[in-house]
Regions:
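C-terminal helix-loop subdomains that flank or include functional centers
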Residues: 285-295, 318-321, 325-475
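Extended, helix-rich architectural segments
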Residues: 1-144, 470-475
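A general structural signal for short secondary-structure junctions and capping/turn motifs
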Residues: 118-123, 155-157, 174-176, 265-268
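Short amphipathic alpha-helical segments
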Residues: 97-98, 105-114, 121, 249, ...
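Extended, charged amphipathic alpha-helical segments
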Residues: 214-347
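Short secondary-structure junctions and interdomain/linker hinges
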Residues: 50, 54, 108-113, 121-128, ...
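A short, surface-exposed helix-loop junction/capping segment
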Residues: 95-102, 306-308, 354-356
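Extended, regular secondary-structure scaffolds
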Residues: 128-237
Length: 475
């Protein structure tokens, strides 16, 4: 059966005398050889601190060949991910029953997956989440490595998918031998078709020769009934509009810093502290000279001979200045914060905001793209809610990223006080540096007990306690 994606190609007269499988084979070969996939894999290697400095060579065997790796790319990625995803988001929906259902979906496991998707997106430019039901019938989100996905879009803006292919390798055991095979999964509105990639063409997986459903319902008699989503189940979470990963902006600077540091280390290791100038040395060769010097602390020279020494110049200030400049440029290009800045710790609240400007701008775009992805995921949440018989209105859903920013707490609290009467109480509380979502539950309990949640009358002042003790003494 032809997929809707293939029918669309036919209607647009984009194919001629070519089968659907042949098109998939062309796309797979092109994808595997593409620069985009190569860059994604390289980004993963740089995150694991496996950088190009390992390729550094020297022209003479005896020379030192340092290969210093600093983990700079990992630090930049983790800073952005930690800033936007480390703190628990504020997720809300009108209706107590709906909120309980929402909390069961966006639990710690799913929030951890969203954070992992954020790391994948920053590294590789785009991350992909696959909605599915687990063995307990719960809606989950599976992160697929970005380089495994070949998306087929309905539009040039890449807003809606027609289909997609996943290409991945897996170990298999045949006749007592462990082998690695490449598997291909083709997803569209009709379900999933499994293939095996031989390196040149596709073959249907003998274990699954028919299109499978996205999920199954099991009847009382154990019969499995396949179902498919009405939408292609793949959600892109982008780092930015162009799906450019952070390594695109930072690789050359990271390579330069590591090369300069490695070369500088080589120079210091190979440079002798003293250079000997020999005059009329009475010896066979320089090897004998060094041996006599180290062993006997003396050397033989003729009557008009002698030994002078020169102090080697090991000034590295120029190299260190270049490394410092490159480091500054790196954080500029990455739109990140250099935590080694001496002035960072003494900055006031307003100064901290200015220092976070670049990081905020970058994370604003990342947050905007993730809000789009979460909105797409809500469609699957609605289907899940309908199956559970839970009323779910996604138009009343909010997902707020709580950024992990260093702030001046006193200034933040005073800003909250100054906002009374301008903003609603909940908005003010959410901006308080000590706020946690659990506060709402405790405030509600206090109100039910007839206590003023903002009253401090339950606590005596120090001077009141003193007066009580004085009265007790008088009695």
């Amino acid at each position: 059966m032809l997929s809707n994606w293939f029918k669309w190609l036919i209607r647009r007269l984009l194919i001629k005398n070519t089968t659907q499988n042949e098109i998939l084979e062309i796309e797979i070969r092109e994808h595997q050889a593409s620069e985009k996939v190569s860059t994604m894999k390289q980004a993963y290697e740089y995150y694991r601190n496996q950088t190009d400095i390992r390729k550094k060579k020297v022209d003479v065997d005896w020379r030192t060949n340092s290969r210093i790796e600093l983990g700079l790319f990992k630090k930049l990625v983790d800073q952005k991910v930690g800033y936007l995803f480390s703190k628990k988001p504020t997720i809300s929906l009108e209706g107590e029953k709906s909120q309980d259902f929402l909390d069961s979906v966006f639990d710690e496991d799913l929030l951890s997956t969203i954070k992992s998707l954020g790391k994948e997106a920053v590294m590789k430019g785009v991350a992909y989440g696959l909605p599915y039901y687990d063995e307990n019938g719960r809606l989950r989100l599976f992160k697929i490595p970005s380089e495994q996905i070949i998306p087929f879009w309905k539009d040039e803006r890449h807003l809606e998918l027609s289909a997609f292919v996943r290409v991945y390798k897996q170990a298999v055991y045949e006749s007592g031998v462990k082998k690695t095979k490449t598997f291909v999964e083709y997803y569209d509105e009709q379900g999933i078709t499994d293939y095996i990639w031989t390196g040149s063409h596709l073959e249907l997986n003998p274990l699954s020769k028919e299109t499978k459903g996205n999920f199954y319902y099991v009847n009382a008699d154990g019969t499995r009934i396949p179902y498919t989503w009405e939408k292609v189940p793949l959600i892109p979470f982008r780092y930015n509009e162009y799906e450019d990963g952070l390594l695109v902006q930072t690789k050359s600077l990271i390579d330069n810093i590591q090369l300069q540091m490695s070369t500088n280390a080589d120079m210091l290791a190979d440079m002798p502290k003293l250079i000997y100038v020999l005059k009329n040395y009475q010896g066979a060769d320089l090897g004998e000279f060094m041996n006599n010097l180290n062993k006997f602390r003396s050397i033989k020279v003729s009557s008009d001979g002698g030994v002078d020494t020169l102090q080697a110049d090991n000034d590295t200030s120029g190299v260190e200045a270049d490394i410092e400049r490159s480091r500054k440029f790196l954080y500029e290009a990455a739109r990140a914060i250099d935590t080694q800045d001496d002035n960072l710790g003494n900055a006031s609240g307003q100064a901290l905001k200015w220092r976070y400007t670049d990081l905020d701008l970058d994370c604003n775009e990342l947050e905007n793209e993730f809000q789009k992805g979460i909105k797409q995921f809500l469609w699957f949440v609605e289907q899940y809610a309908a199956n559970k018989g839970v009323a779910f209105d996604s138009s009343k859903f909010t997902y707020v990223f709580n950024r992990d920013i260093i702030s001046n707490e006193s200034e933040a609290i005073q800003d909250c006080v100054n906002s009374i009467g301008i903003l609603d109480d909940l908005s003010i509380r959410e901006q308080h540096p000590w706020y946690q979502p659990e506060v709402e539950k405790r405030l509600k309990e206090q109100q039910e007990q007839g206590q003023d949640p903002y009253s401090q009358t339950n606590f005596k002042k120090v001077d009141e306690d003193h007066d009580d003790r004085e009265q007790e003494k008088d009695r």
